[in-house]
Amino acid sequence: MTYVNPSLQRAIAQRWKLVDSLRPLPPEVVASLGKVFRTEFTYNTNALEGNTLTLRETQLILEEGQTVGGKSLREVYEARNHPEAIGYVESLASDARRLSVSDVLTLHQIVMKDAAGPGRTGVLRRGEVRISGSRHVPPPAYEVPRLMDALVDDINDNPDERTTVEQAAVVLHGLVHVHPFYDGNGRVARLLANLVLMRRRYQPIVVLKQDRRRYLTCLEKADAGDLRPICAFVAQYELKHLDMVLRAVEQTPGARLLSLEEAAERASTSAGYLRLLANKGYIPAVKDGRGWAIAEGDLDAYARARRKRRAPKRPR
């Protein structure tokens, strides 16, 4: 079963092929993108979990080692730990060996070092947990080891032959669903999703704090058995990050971003309708910080397909 709309999947495949044809990327581009990613990923992944550090405060901690007045040590540790965690994921991505549950435990230990309670880093939970604000009740602790073995096997073998983006989304939801740790589950899940992407030469993604409500809604729908929203969510972010690479190396044919209002005028439709399609993952739109946007080339492809569907069929 395919979980990502074909038009969105085609846009990702086209960008991926172009990025892959440009490898190796210029070292200065890799360094610049890596620096931005580390800061923005660290800020957003922690902010999604309630950390109150600003983007600028996060940058000061990462780049200058400064402490920040008025913030808890836990919040500072959560920021400080992430560059090492990202580096660990990068090393796993370049390693051909099979991922193990031990690797996931090591990742959790790095992420939550000094930020979680004693004896709660790098170990699976031994008690029951609840997810604040969610109707989902994680499985009992005695099932967690078996479920984690199954999740890691799924990462290694992809038995359902999902696309890379779909596999990343399923892994992201899978770890949050199992909730194997007392704390840090969302952070580790987003890092593992990026590991799946990076192992197959896709770009790691940053889920924005502003997208928290949509993100949680997608996870809730996945809990209920509908994986399409979370797969579309991850796919839209992957498209955005592939475009960021192409803009960095100035290889962006037809990639000028249009607001949905501009796009609606060009496509002779309404911005509300395009927004509905974007929210459902039916068009290759991305969140650009201000709202939804779509690349000119993707809009033109959508408009052509729309005209083709509406064209009267020739009589036989």
What function would you assign to each model-found segment?
Residues 1-183, 187-316:
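FIC/Doc superfamily catalytic core
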